Amino acid sequence: MTATAPVKTEYEAVIGLETHVQLGTATKIFSNASTEFGADPNTHIDPVVLGLPGTLPVLNQKVLEYAVKAGLALNCQIAPYSKFDRKQYFYPDLPKNYQISQYDLPIAEHGWIEIEVAEKGKEPYTKKIGVTRLHMEEDAGKLVHAGSDRLAGSTHSLVDYNRAGVALAEIVSEPDLRTGKEAAEYAQELRRIMRYLGVSDGNMAEGSLRCDVNISIRPKGTEKFGTKVEIKYMNSFNAIQRAIEFEIERQIRCLETGEPIVQETRLWDEGKQVTKSMRSKEGSSDYRYFPEPDLGPIEVSETQRETWRSELPELPAQKRHRYAEQYGLSAYDARVLTDEKSTADYYEATVAAGADAKQAANWLMGDIAAYVNANKLLVSDLPLQPQDLAELVNLIEAGTISGKIAKEILPELLEKGGSPKAIVEAKGLTQISDPAQIEALVDELLAAHPTELEQFRAGKTKLQGFFVGQLMKKTGGRVDPKLSNQILNQKLKG
């Protein structure tokens, strides 16, 4: 009797993200100390930040506004009553030895966002990801380890309290994510929403947006969760995806070899592209939460909530859907144009100024995007105004200039701005579209190249490209390409 081969178990990952978003207020959450990034160490501190005896925290009302607006944008229920709590732990970057956070009564709960996932070789799909909660808290300081980028290997450590007390919104997702790609898309969509709202710049390099990943593995088709592992220190969306993909493989390998998966916190080593064990994972009981005695309860009235709701901008997902319907753009084009609010605003202003929607999109996603990215700018920083881009698009559409001429004058427009029409007229770049004028130019060209003309008529048809190139050279690229090709074809065939 032939033995059947064992069926290989298929596994799936269960992933949730905890995202810390620095709220872009001018002062800290409980004090008047500045939140400016990049200042000299320990210059943006005060007695409240340091927790000196006799000081009392006072909630920055702008933080509450930003947190509620973020919660509304994430389709959360806003709590009419919430409170702050003390989260107790000892670490050098925490000057009070406790962090003021929110525990059992967060400001926002039970939300969701929709992500669009496009993986190479697979059909794109949308997925709704639950948002468990959003709560307010204060950031910790920052440790600098001399001689190493980590504590291990350093000779000594320094602490900078400038970041301590900066307002954070911690956004916790449901464990609805299944792949590294989904997690990266979720984090990017969160960043887009926060930037559209204007509540955060979402700058990962400066720590304005930081993600911790919780991940476990289980056999497909089962409901029970596996042992959860937390991953920290991913400083880009690509790093989030790669860290998760590595950790999925590591945990599957553990299950298949019988090695136990330990509940722990691991760090992502960008250089080696691996996760490394950092410490055992704490539970909430380890923090000994209790209500913050120095702050009163937080109350948000229905009137205040609805006032803030009315101030929300059109969000990225809404814009994407509208661009597809109103402008007839592809899902890809709509996604690119709405990635940054400044680009979306610029695009809409260009179309409103009379430009064809698709042509305006092509210019913004092509040559203009290349210039903006190379110079680390936003589209809104450009001297080229939306109405001037619309004028450029319309000059091409009307046949006044060719696309080639438009590309030639674009660098000047991007660097100095101005009217494309005025530049074209001043430089004599208007397109030659008169059939009689083009015919005369073609006659001159053929008369100047009798040998090539004879070879073409003898069957060497590839020489047509030669004649096209010579005509463009003769006219400086100003001749109407479609009309000139028609006339050239007629003349070449005799």
Swiss-Prot record:
Gene Ontology terms: biological process: glutaminyl-tRNAGln biosynthesis via transamidation; translation
Signal peptide location: none
Protein family: Belongs to the GatB/GatE family. GatB subfamily.
Top EC class for this record: ligase
Gene name, Swiss-Prot/TrEMBL: gatB
Keywords for this protein: ATP-binding, Ligase, Nucleotide-binding, Protein biosynthesis
One MF annotation (Gene Ontology) recorded for this entry: ATP binding
PANTHER family the record matches: GLUTAMYL-TRNA GLN AMIDOTRANSFERASE SUBUNIT B MITOCHONDRIAL AND PROKARYOTIC PET112-RELATED (PTHR11659), GLUTAMYL-TRNA(GLN) AMIDOTRANSFERASE SUBUNIT B, MITOCHONDRIAL (PTHR11659:SF0)
Purpose of the protein: Allows the formation of correctly charged Asn-tRNA(Asn) or Gln-tRNA(Gln) through the transamidation of misacylated Asp-tRNA(Asn) or Glu-tRNA(Gln) in organisms which lack either or both of asparaginyl-tRNA or glutaminyl-tRNA synthetases. The reaction takes place in the presence of glutamine and ATP through an activated phospho-Asp-tRNA(Asn) or phospho-Glu-tRNA(Gln).
UniProt name for this protein: Aspartyl/glutamyl-tRNA(Asn/Gln) amidotransferase subunit B
Annotated catalysed reactions: L-glutamyl-tRNA(Gln) + L-glutamine + ATP + H2O = L-glutaminyl-tRNA(Gln) + L-glutamate + ADP + phosphate + H(+); L-aspartyl-tRNA(Asn) + L-glutamine + ATP + H2O = L-asparaginyl-tRNA(Asn) + L-glutamate + ADP + phosphate + 2 H(+)
PROSITE patterns: GATB
Keyword rRNA processing in annotation: no
Enzyme Commission number(s) of this protein: 6.3.5.-
Gene3D superfamilies: 1.10.10.410, GatB domain, N-terminal subdomain
Keyword Nucleotide-binding on entry: yes
Subunit structure: Heterotrimer of A, B and C subunits.
